[in-house]
């Protein structure tokens, strides 16, 4: 039998078989497949970001008597998770955060008010996940979604707190806007810093 000479003589055919990609896929095709995060990793992220948001919610600039406060960017972890993972995970994590807020700082006057002011209001932060390519728009949509839920709750359930002669809608807009607007400004600023510093990655 004739032996190969030259560079080909050093090639082991078994090595060629070992490096061939399985299932008929080329190396380039396999490298282009999207990476899918495991459910365990996603759950760990949800728990971590909800815990961080809860911790930040205790750092208050000021609080209002019927609920609502300006914090050290407590909405940012939830908004960032929504931008990072998309609306499905974002809405879930935001609703969980709302339930945690209900557990640690409840202000209850009616079951429907609880639904509006906690899982729906905080859950709206997850809407940011629909705008992964436009994070600052996503932050605005999420926070204004929260404002809307609190506003409706205020009109329906807190009208009696309005000063005499003031329409409940005006009262609710002023009351809820007094802490949502500063929270919006703080959140946008922190998201901007994180985005520019590349400390965290929005996209996987």
Roles of regions detected by a PLM:
Residues 17-83, 88-92:
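Hydrophobic transmembrane alpha-helices
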Residues 1-50, 170-204:
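Alpha-helical transmembrane segments and their cytosolic interface
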